[in-house]
Amino acid sequence: KRDVGDDLTNGEPSFVGHRIQKMVFFRNRIALLSEENIILSRVNDFYNFWVKTAMAISNADPIDLQSSSTYPTRLFDAVENAGGLVIFSASEQFLLSSGAEALLTPETAKITYAASYAFNSDSNPVSLGTTIGFLNNTAREARFYEISEVSTRNEPTVVEQSKIVAELFPQNLTNVTASTENQLLLFAVDSTLHTAT
């Protein structure tokens, strides 16, 4: 609930009236993905998306950013890595970070373009330790990609890890999970989803 200000000085978070695609935890904030926006709560006040004072910007204030691209960028999922929060749309990946600054604040937070790989929005990207894996189902068979070194300074490295077994992957893969301790990846099809076969 808004305690201070009005619609001009303390406007509603951009998720109001829109579907929330995903909720993740990032740097002591709850992050909501809604349409092409990412909205982060106040620091350590996980369900508060309002500023505390309309007079000045605080480092703990909520963050509300929009991704921008030449393609539609509805955001579906996100995974944290060393460089920040890697965010997935159906056709691109973005990085939410504080740039060279140590603290993630409303003034330092920014979303930058990272890569342009198709992502199966019915699936979830998975952390593989220091890298991130994700499914792509735009070809005849599904593909599994691994993205690493995502930062604001360099282009990430993206490798198709499923190339060696490409013809064994059905096109409608939707579930992937990883066990870094056992060096194991498991893939499955969720038969409750309406996906192409």
Regions found by a protein language model. Give the residues of each.
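A short helix->beta-strand "capping" segment at the edge of beta-propeller domains
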Residues: 2-18, 54-71, 158-169
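Elongated fiber/stalk and passenger scaffolds
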Residues: 4-15, 22, 29, 133-139, ...
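Beta-sheet-dominated scaffold domains
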Residues: 37, 44, 66-197
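Homeobox/homeodomain signature
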Residues: 5, 13, 28-29, 83, ...
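Beta-propeller domains
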Residues: 1-5, 11, 33-60, 96-104
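Beta-strand-rich domains and repeat architectures in extracellular enzymes and scaffolds
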Residues: 11-36, 72-79
